[in-house]
Amino acid sequence: MDADAFVANWHAEKERLLSAACMAGTECEAKITAMGLSSGQTAQLHDLLGTFATDVMYTLLLGLDGSASLGNDQRSYTLLDEDGSVIAKEGDLEAAAYAWFQEGRAPRR
């Protein structure tokens, strides 16, 4: 796995979480329904949640890369797969995160 594949998994997880949150029968969906929003307002809320999730994941990835702080601490971390191979060198996660979360890179087929 390289930095791009690692970030692609984060992006896929973001999409899965957003889809699951809006599924009927979930606590999140019940709370949104209880708000009594119009369909337009509900769409705006879903858009807001997507923006928030993007910002959170992007910031966390940059924090792991050393390009942003996590809390009050900014440092680079070495990401290893289960075999001990380095997934990303410094700067690799930042570049991949920008492509996926800011430029909207689509999954490769």
What are these regions (language model features)?
Residues 12-15, 19, 23, 37, ...:
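Generic surface-pattern signal
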Residues 1-42, 70-72:
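N-terminal low-complexity, intrinsically disordered segments
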Residues 84-109:
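Short, functional C-terminal segments
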Residues 40-93:
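Amphipathic protein-protein interaction modules
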Residues 8, 60, 79, 100-103:
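Intrinsically disordered, low-complexity regions enriched in small/polar residues
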